[in-house]
Amino acid sequence: MDGFDKTMKFSIQDEKQSVHVNDVLLTVYDALQEKGYNPINQIVGYLLSGDPAYIPRHKDARSIVRKLERDEIIEELVKSYLKHHREE
């Protein structure tokens, strides 16, 4: 019964680490543009609502964007914005 007394760790970090926010956003942006949507409006709609219907299946964009948590995407967007617009 010793094997049942130990807590096992489960990690899915490897998949998440291989997905970069920048790559995801560019793929989603291109897919939306190719389908004739306003990419900014659609991405904002997804980030605010969490509804994947804002992102098309074209280029597998919907499943790619769902590999990241929305807060991870928002965090990276804020970091990037501040990095490029901050007065020093």
UniProtKB/Swiss-Prot annotation:
Annotated TM spans: none
A Pfam family of this chain: IreB
Coiled coil: none
InterPro entries linked to this entry: IreB
Family membership: Belongs to the UPF0297 family.
Protein name stated in the entry: UPF0297 protein BcerKBAB4_4234
Organism: Bacillus mycoides (strain KBAB4) (Bacillus weihenstephanensis)
